[in-house]
């Protein structure tokens, strides 16, 4: 009719595009197999029609670049550079060929370790508790574990807002990374009141008795987590 407009969409559906090959350019130490192993994007194979293997997803591929960087950081390559990948499609638009340029750089070891800021223990005691050690190959995941452990140590003693910042100094000539943990503990936090909301299964005191702390105690992350596990074990709540 003169007052209506019909709109038609013509869809030309193609077969699923498959990642045929991933090529790494410039990797002298890490093998292609190692690098492909950390990526979410995988090359297609004869079982690809049954699984998602070989499927190209742009968001997953963007994460892959971060995963490759993390892999190198965990193996001492603190100056690694992952270049912009190139993605080429086959003439029949069925396959993708991906090339990823890499500048690995050199392996770095840990040099001097130190602490600064607001310490709850002596520097010697804090250093003794670290997993990372001077002279060993730099490993960012291992460093992350130490940062988490320091966070937990402070949060279990009332410092719920502690801030742990790793400060690095890279010596390109000696191939070492000096590392200083800067600790800002913030104000000490106490349990003022334990409130129970949304409970329709039992009396509130049944829930409160699962806490190993009382009102007025310093906040303690470990005790909060333990109370949560004990409450789950009661099977009253989801």
Predicted regions, residues:
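Interaction-mediating elements
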Residues: 1-234
């Amino acid at each position: 009719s003169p007052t209506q407009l019909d709109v038609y969409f013509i869809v030309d559906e193609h077969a699923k595009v498959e990642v045929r090959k991933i090529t790494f350019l410039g990797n002298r130490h890490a093998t292609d197999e190692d690098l492909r192993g950390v990526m979410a994007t995988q090359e297609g194979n004869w079982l690809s029609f049954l699984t998602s293997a070989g499927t190209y997803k742009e968001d997953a591929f963007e994460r892959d670049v971060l995963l490759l960087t993390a892999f190198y950081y965990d193996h001492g390559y603190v100056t690694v550079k992952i270049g912009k990948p190139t993605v080429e499609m086959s003439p029949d638009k069925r396959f993708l060929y991906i090339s990823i340029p890499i500048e690995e750089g050199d392996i770095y070891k840990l040099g001097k370790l130190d602490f600064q800021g607001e310490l709850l223990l002596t520097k010697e005691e804090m250093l003794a508790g670290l997993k990372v050690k001077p002279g060993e190959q730099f490993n960012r995941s291992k460093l992350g574990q130490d940062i988490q452990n320091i966070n937990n140590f402070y949060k279990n003693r009332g410092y719920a807002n502690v801030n742990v910042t790793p400060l690095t100094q890279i010596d390109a000539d000696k191939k070492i990374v000096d590392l200083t943990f800067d600790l800002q503990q913030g104000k000490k936090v106490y349990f003022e009141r334990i409130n129970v909301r949304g409970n329709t299964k039992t009396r509130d005191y049944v829930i409160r008795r699962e806490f190993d702390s009382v009102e007025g105690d310093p906040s303690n992350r470990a005790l909060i987590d333990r109370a949560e596990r004990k409450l789950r074990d009661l099977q009253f709540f989801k």
